[in-house]
């Protein structure tokens, strides 16, 4: 496995990334969102690479920072993780950690074609503007840093979605803090897991989740009582 690029290389790639078209639709608050990406890279000599695929944004969940650090990204490499970790360390981005949006790359394809990258981007933007059903973006970025370009686009989409998502979550009281200073959404999720844990296998899964979330001690007595009953 190649070593991750330096911070300077990653941030330079992010700086070279340009979002040509961003979808008017936002990420769903109470459901999954399939985000279609089209990343164009100028290869020189009148050639460009077009990479297209889907990033699945899972239903936003209120999660602990401990869980986010280990579980937020699936199937992304070290460069993408490094870029997003730096972005999320900024004060104005901390809310993303609370939502724990999980991105999973899938259905990726690529092709090399002839043409001018700006003109092709304009044509693809016109097509995207006519597609009201999809959530998709058109991005121009360096060929060697696809995942960094994706993170630039995804972060911008998340930042636009946060106010709307937060409003809908707050209306249901899911952002309020409850037991152990945990958001009510986390407590509700764990309560549901306890109610559905009718076998030792499910109890083991619940125990792993509590440890992944970094909240095992908060529910320790309740968990061992459940485990005792199921044995």
Residues of each region from the PLM?
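Surface-exposed polar/charged interaction patches
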Residues: 33, 46, 86, 90, ...
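Generic, low-specificity signal for short hydrophobic/alpha-helical stretches with a mild N-terminal bias
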Residues: 102, 106, 110, 132-139, ...
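Terminal low-complexity "docking" segments
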Residues: 1-156
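Alpha-helical context
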Residues: 56, 60-63, 100, 104, ...
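Alpha-helical oligomerization segments
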Residues: 177-231
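Short helix/strand-capping turn motifs
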Residues: 136-183
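Extended amphipathic alpha-helical regions
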Residues: 124, 128-147, 161, 185-191, ...
């Amino acid at each position: 496995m190649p070593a991750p690029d330096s911070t300077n290389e990653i941030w330079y790639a992010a700086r070279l990334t340009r979002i040509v078209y961003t979808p008017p639709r936002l990420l769903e608050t109470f459901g999954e969102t399939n985000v279609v990406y089209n990343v164009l890279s100028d290869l020189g000599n009148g050639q460009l690479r077009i990479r297209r695929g889907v990033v699945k944004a899972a239903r936003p969940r209120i999660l602990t920072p401990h869980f986010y650090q280990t579980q937020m990204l699936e199937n992304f490499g070290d460069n993408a993780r490094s870029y997003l970790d730096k972005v999320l360390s900024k004060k104005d981005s901390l809310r993303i950690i609370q939502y724990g949006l999980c991105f999973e790359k899938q259905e990726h394809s690529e092709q090399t074609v002839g043409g001018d990258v700006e003109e092709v981007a304009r044509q693809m933007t016109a097509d995207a503007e006519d597609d009201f059903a999809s959530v998709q973006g058109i991005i121009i970025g360096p060929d060697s840093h696809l995942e960094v370009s994706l993170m630039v686009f995804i972060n911008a989409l998340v930042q636009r979605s946060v106010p709307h998502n937060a409003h809908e979550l707050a209306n249901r009281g899911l952002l309020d803090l409850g037991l152990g200073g945990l958001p009510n959404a986390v407590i509700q999720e764990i309560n549901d897991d306890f109610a559905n844990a009718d076998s030792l296998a499910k109890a083991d899964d619940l125990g792993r989740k509590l440890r992944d979330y970094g909240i095992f001690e908060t529910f320790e007595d309740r968990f061992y009582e459940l485990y005792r009953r199921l044995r």
